[in-house]
């Protein structure tokens, strides 16, 4: 893992990006401080997004303040992934963004997302809503379970309601 952490300082952008992703996959706590530095200093959105995701995979509490800052980032994917990372750590600060991600109409305001990607985002948000059970999510989950255009999304929402909220639809 130490070699991977050293790769975070590689001169090659591709190598750096690969190292950022790899330290997340192996959940290297050694990388947390360096990943936060990347978030503070990198001008590259792909590096910042990968660092955000890696901090979520690692799940180290030292990242919570930075992830909370990222909830207001200019880049939507970074806001979204920081919310998911925080939810994995049980942080309720993620709730408003996760709630937005359960809303198909909200997601359709992002022209860069196609229907397949929107479904994927919603399904990730449904799964995330089961990590940090909160009544805020219930109305959105019920709406998805009853009325969403995707049967896969409906099914996942039904299962989440049953498993986490003891609700049968």
PLM regions and their residue ranges:
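A short, hydrophobic/aromatic-rich structural module that often spans a beta strand
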Residues: 82, 139-167
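Short inter-helical turns and helix N-cap capping residues of alpha-solenoid HEAT/ARM repeat scaffolds
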Residues: 11-12, 43-44, 74-75, 106, ...
């Amino acid at each position: 893992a130490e070699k991977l952490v050293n790769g975070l300082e590689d001169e090659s952008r591709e190598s750096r990006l690969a190292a950022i992703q790899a330290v997340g996959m192996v959940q290297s706590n050694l990388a947390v401080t360096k990943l936060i530095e990347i978030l503070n200093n990198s001008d590259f959105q792909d590096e910042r997004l990968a660092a955000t995701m890696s901090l979520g995979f690692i799940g180290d509490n030292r990242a919570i303040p930075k992830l909370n800052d990222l909830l207001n980032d200019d880049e939507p994917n970074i806001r979204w992934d920081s919310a998911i990372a925080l939810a994995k750590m049980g942080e309720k600060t993620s709730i408003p963004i996760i709630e937005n991600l359960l809303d198909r109409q909200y997601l359709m305001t992002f022209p860069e997302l196609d229907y397949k990607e929107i479904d994927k985002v919603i399904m990730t948000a449904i799964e995330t809503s089961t990590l940090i059970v909160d009544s805020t999510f219930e109305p959105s989950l019920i709406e998805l379970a009853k009325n969403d255009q995707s049967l896969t999304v409906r099914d996942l929402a039904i299962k989440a309601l049953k498993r986490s909220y003891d609700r049968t639809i």
